[in-house]
Structure formats: C-alpha cells, structure tokens
C-alpha cells in the first residue's frame, strides 16, 4: 500500500468509552459483604510498576512464541496464516507503507492497532438474523410508510442504568414513538456492536426491556395534548464536571420551538460543547413530562404562573431592583461530582416540599368549599 488506510475505515469508539473521563461505561464499585471488610481499590496502587511487569511478561511470551514458530512444520504455518486471514476485525498495519511517518509515533500506532474495522449497520443486523436480511427490509418498509414529516413526533426520554460483567452502562437518549424505522431489538444490536459486545443476547435483552418499560410508562403521558399552559421550568443538566442551570418560562402547547432547537440555541449562546445538546434536550423532555403529570393530577394551577413578570402579565419585563433578574439567567459552573449530586438532592427535596405545600393548600380549599356547602344547605333547610 502506498498510502494510509481510508478515512473512517477503522473505529476506536469501544476503547474511548472505556476511558475514566467518559461516564457512559464505568467499572462498578466493589461491594462489601461485611461492614468491617476493607474494599481494595487497585487504581490507588502504582500502575507504572504493574505496567512494567506486564511488559516484561509480554516480552518473554513473544520470545517463547518466536522459538515455537521456528520449530513448526509447513502444515502448521499454513494453518496459522489461514487463522490470521480469517480475523477480519483487526486491521493489517504491519505491511503498510507510511510515507508521512505518522505511524512512528507510539500513541498513534497504538490507536491504529487497537481499533477495529468499521462495519455497516446493515451487515450487523443481517448477521443478527442469520444473514437473511429480512429484518432490515421490514424496517425500511415500515419506516417509509409509517413515518413521514407530517406526523407529529411523540418523544420520550430514555435512561439506561445497567450492569454487565462488573461494569455499569449509564446512558440517556430520546425515542420517537411515531418513528418505526428501527425496532428496539435492532437498536440493541447496534448499541452492543458499538460497545464491542456483539452477539451478547443477555445485554441486548436488558436494553430492550429497559427501553420498553419506560415507553409503556410514559406513552400515554407524552401523547397528551395540553391547552395553552405557561409553566416555569427549573432545568439542571450536568456533563462531566460542568453543571448547567437555567430558569425560564415554557408554553406546553407551543410547537414552534422544540427542546432540540432550544438546546442548540443554549449551546451556541453559552459556548458549550455540542455534547450538551442531547443532554439539555433530554432534561427538558423529562421536566415537561413531570409538569404534564402534575397538571393531570391537579397539582398545577394554570391561572397563576410565578414568573415574576411586571404588572401581572403572563410574560415580559421583570422589575427586579435587588438582583436584576439573576434568577432568570443561565449559569454554568465547574463542580465536583459530589457537589453536583448534592445540588440534585437539594433540587429533589425542594420539589417534594413544594408539592406537599401545594397539596396542603388544595386540601384546605377543598375543606372550605365543603364547609360552605354545608352552611348553605343548613340555611336552605331553615328557610
């Protein structure tokens, strides 16, 4: 070969998500069987010494392999070449010409050697159904006939929190109920392929069950069309060590601005990384579902919106001399994981407290109404 491999020919995604800085795929914390038992965290030890031991052991293994290969017969050597040729998942970079000299850097060469050959998703789905390709054709037909641009999307936020072989998979995304171009089983196949867990039926079944449970739970709630209702949304979203917090007014019946468009505008205005776009949209969808649930249960008063607007208007200018409207401005803070969890716990406590207070007010109003009705009834009977 006279040039490097073509672009996007190799993928190293399965190795990148195993990095400690990526919270998608993390190692589960060891549990203690006894309260006095000590949990050993091997990451606290000197990894350089362990790495030197592994390198020395690998060198010894390579020397033994060279001596054993020299003693092989012709038949064994041919069988070994056939086995290497059948391994299509690993790139062949040993015999590749490098005119630019980029592969002389150890980190770049290591990245190439640890990567896999990228496979089209159609081939992954065909391999999952035994190579017949029927599932792919059905999905394409359903997607062409069942989903169009005129159909209103019903989006449900999905969260995954699974454990598999000592690792935790924590992820979030959105699922459109009116888009039938991809089934849950096909999505699980592609998801496991990206994580380098191909043909793992147990993990695929866990993913399908987790998504299906959340779809059944929020399907009716997400399909409800509410009237012209203005609400206050206190949105918090954390990604890595950054915490985004905002307080704004949202009309649940206004379809001119979607959560995805709102997230894109926020990312552009605040100069955040594009990874915040799906995170903000997902958090906004979750907040909208919670508000819809409160509205259906009668815990939301549509006549009074605490937006702080001047002259009692639904929206507009806010007259705030003390803080100059700082409570209605977006904030981005760099916090530790413990501080972010503390903020989330405080937010949940405040939401539960406000819900209890609103329930008490509704109960008092109901009692007063009942008492007035009894007084009116007694007055009528006397007359």
From Swiss-Prot:
Keywords: Cell cycle, Chromatin regulator, Nucleus, Transcription, Transcription regulation
Extent of the signal sequence: none
Compositionally biased residues, Basic and acidic residues: 64-80
Annotated localization: Nucleus
InterPro entries: Sfh1/SNF5 (IPR017393), SNF5 (IPR006939)
Cell cycle found in the keyword field: yes
Pfam families associated with the record: SNF5
Region (Disordered): 61-80
Biological process terms in GO annotation: chromatin remodeling; chromatin remodeling at centromere; chromosome segregation; double-strand break repair; G2/M transition of mitotic cell cycle; nucleosome disassembly; regulation of nuclear cell cycle DNA replication; regulation of transcription by RNA polymerase II
GO molecular function: nucleosome binding; transcription coregulator activity
Superkingdom of origin organism: Eukaryota
Major subcellular location class: nucleus
Regions that span the bilayer: none
GO cellular component, one term: nuclear chromosome
Record-stated family: Belongs to the SNF5 family.
Chain's role: Part of the chromatin structure-remodeling complex (RSC) which is involved in transcription regulation and nucleosome positioning. RSC is responsible for the transfer of a histone octamer from a nucleosome core particle to naked DNA. The reaction requires ATP and involves an activated RSC-nucleosome intermediate. Remodeling reaction also involves DNA translocation, DNA twist and conformational change.
Protein name per the record: Chromatin structure-remodeling complex subunit SFH1
Species annotation: Eremothecium gossypii (strain ATCC 10895 / CBS 109.51 / FGSC 9923 / NRRL Y-1056)
């Amino acid at each position: 070969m006279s040039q490097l491999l073509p672009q996007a020919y190799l993928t190293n995604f399965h190795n990148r998500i195993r990095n400690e800085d990526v919270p998608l795929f993390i190692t589960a914390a060891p549990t203690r069987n006894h309260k006095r038992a000590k949990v050993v965290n091997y990451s606290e030890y000197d990894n350089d010494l362990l790495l030197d031991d592994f390198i020395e052991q690998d060198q010894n293994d390579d020397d033994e392999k060279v001596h054993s290969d020299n003693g092989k017969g012709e038949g064994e050597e041919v069988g070994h070449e056939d086995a290497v040729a059948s391994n299509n998942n690993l790139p062949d970079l040993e015999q590749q010409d490098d005119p630019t000299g980029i592969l002389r850097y150890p980190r770049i060469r290591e990245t190439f050697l640890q990567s896999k050959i990228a496979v089209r998703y159609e081939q992954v789905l065909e391999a999952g159904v035994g190579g017949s390709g029927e599932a792919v054709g059905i999905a394409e037909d359903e997607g062409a006939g069942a989903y169009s641009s005129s159909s209103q999307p019903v989006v449900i936020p999905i969260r995954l929190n699974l454990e598999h072989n000592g690792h935790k998979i924590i992820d979030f995304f959105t699922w459109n109920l009116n888009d039938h171009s991809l089934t849950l089983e096909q999505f699980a196949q592609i998801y496991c392929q990206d994580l380098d867990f191909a043909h793992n039926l147990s993990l695929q079944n866990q993913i399908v069950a987790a998504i299906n449970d959340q779809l059944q739970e929020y399907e009716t709630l997400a399909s409800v069309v509410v009237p012209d209702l203005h609400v206050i949304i206190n949105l918090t979203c954390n990604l890595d060590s950054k915490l985004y917090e905002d307080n704004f007014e949202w009309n649940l019946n206004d379809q001119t601005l979607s959560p995805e468009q709102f997230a894109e505008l926020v990312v552009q205005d605040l100069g955040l990384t594009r990874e915040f776009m799906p995170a903000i949209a997902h958090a906004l969808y979750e907040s909208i579902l919670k508000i819809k649930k409160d509205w259906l249960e009668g815990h939301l008063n549509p006549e009074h919106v605490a937006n702080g607007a001047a002259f009692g208007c639904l929206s507009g200018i806010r007259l705030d001399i003390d803080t100059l409207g700082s409570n209605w401005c977006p904030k981005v803070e760099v916090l530790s994981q413990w501080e972010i969890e503390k903020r989330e716990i405080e937010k949940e406590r405040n939401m539960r407290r406000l819900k209890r207070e609103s329930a008490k007010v509704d109960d008092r109003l109901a009692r007063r109404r009942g008492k007035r009705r009894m007084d009116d009834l007694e007055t009528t009977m006397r007359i």
